[in-house]
């Protein structure tokens, strides 16, 4: 058997593994979704301090913030803290306007220009925590919106034995433009299922930084979120620290929504290259498993080798089944794909492959106008005020 034919069969094996990996991740996601449908807590609700670290105007910011003032939660049992570097932040008047519409919900505005660490988000969280009154803390990004029952469901996790932290998977919505649509297909179709699989199968403390509910007891046990101000992946490292401290870390598929409206291709590429480099620094050899996420490159490699016509037909059927399964799973969990999205699935796969390759090398990234180099465990080694 020639080397060319062997390569063809090897590529087909890779395609088969890619399909199997997607099936496993989809099952893990659906299982997590079923577990998240428990009854929200009624009576004896714990106090929650909701912390919003804001820097600039995120997509859909006003509507996102509004959703937190419409939570179905007892008056006086939660508060919302907005944290800024200064009153000059363009998000401040928006947050103030929303808060003024809801005087019954306690709101606190924190301004602290100090940057003791390279992670600006952690700096904002740290400043706000000094003013938080309750024993449960919800870290929530500016582009996140929630349903009214969200907080009741979230706090119900803490009725279980020794839970110290629960984070929430998210669904990206509202994408406009090709680049944003491709990004949304990755976020909803690859990232969420992969995160659920790692959490369920490998018992990794996969923490999604968009929405993290953590007990103050767990935070105190790991010396607070400020201990991670020099790292870029503060969410994953917080989850790992909380678990090592003896607390349970849970991943909820009671999805929050994120606004991913319209971004340039350059912005999408920079974001996902940064994330890929972070995952490589954290995952080590496990990063290689991400090569199974996109099915199309394996199909094209099989097609290029063309060891047998029957194998080509089988490969094409597997690829079609993979995409149809993603469309079906999306409908089940509430992220229905339209025709334009479905036609972009192959482009999404090629983009994911390119991002994987880009994440293999380099350390220099840009985040919110700052250039930095990522060190071991995403340690921020250098920091400047100019984007890379």
Task: Tell me the role of every PLM-derived stretch.
Residues 9, 16, 20, 27-31, ...:
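Membrane-embedded multi-pass helical conduit in multi-pass membrane proteins
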Residues 1-44, 181-185, 193, 197, ...:
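N-terminal membrane-anchoring/stem segments of glycan-assembly enzymes
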Residues 48-57, 64, 71, 83-85:
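A conserved hydrophobic helix/loop-capping motif in glycosyltransferases and polysaccharide synthases
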Residues 66-116:
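Acidic donor-binding segment of Leloir-type glycosyltransferases
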Residues 230, 236-258:
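Catalytic donor-sugar/metal-binding loop of nucleotide-sugar-dependent glycosyltransferases
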Residues 46-49, 79, 237:
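Cell-envelope/extracellular polymer assembly enzymes that use nucleotide-activated donors
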Residues 99-130, 134, 153-222, 226, ...:
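Long helical/loop segments within the catalytic core of UDP-sugar-dependent glycosyltransferases
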Residues 90, 141-157:
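Acidic donor-binding/catalytic loop of UDP-sugar-dependent glycosyltransferases
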